[in-house]
A protein has these predicted regions:
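N-terminal secretory signal peptides that target proteins for export/translocation
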Residues: 1-3
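Bacterial N-terminal signal peptides
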Residues: 8-18
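Hydrophobic small-molecule pocket/channel-lining residues, especially in calycin-type beta-barrels
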Residues: 22-184
Length: 184
């Protein structure tokens, strides 16, 4: 019984000491919040439609819902997209795009980071660059010579995005395009 009481006292003391040390950590989020405010125009619920290439000459139409939320007191954005289209053989509605991204600002590098994850199990990191009308980011294939580049332009409540593919970083082919409207 004494050992349990001693263990409980030690555990409680450890929690008090560690909790106090955690609470004393300085808040360094100011520069991050300030930089992330530049992306406030993106926050909202968005719906629309578009097309993507599924192979040579195989253009597929889709509808999409994108949710962009400010999280952790404005330190990050959570971006979640769900795109649905029709199966070419059966005509049944299928999910073709289900992705999640976390956008943050790295004050040491003075750069925005785009960390993404897809339903296919892929993930990656990219620098997100602000442009005059929106933003862009580029993904480089691991172990393969290819690049994907995405551009988003937002004017008022309209989000226009297109993606491009390149094997050499010089010649680009448009592989997807979508236009969304802010619904919330």
């Amino acid at each position: 019984m004494r050992q349990r009481a001693l263990a409980s006292v030690l555990c409680f003391t450890f929690m008090l000491v560690c909790g106090g040390a955690w609470a004393q950590r300085p808040d360094t989020s100011g520069p991050q919040r300030e930089a992330m405010q530049k992306l406030d125009f993106w926050v909202g619920e968005w719906e629309g439609s578009g097309w993507s290439m599924r192979g040579p000459g195989q253009r597929a139409e889709f509808t999409v819902h994108e949710s962009v939320q400010s999280k952790l007191g404005g330190v990050v954005l959570l971006v979640q997209g769900l795109g649905k289209g029709k199966d070419a053989t059966t005509g049944a509605e299928t999910v073709g795009h289900d992705a999640l991204a976390v956008v943050s600002f790295d004050p040491k590098a003075a750069a925005y980071r785009f960390h993404h994850y897809t339903m296919q199990g892929t993930s990656g990191d990219a620098d997100l660059v602000l442009t005059d009308k929106g933003m862009q980011w580029e993904l480089v294939g691991e172990g393969q010579a290819f690049r994907m580049r995405f551009h988003i332009e937002i004017q008022g409540d309209t989000w226009h995005e297109y993606g491009e593919f390149s094997r050499d970083g010089q010649t680009w082919t448009r592989t997807m395009e979508m236009t969304l409207q802010r619904v919330k």
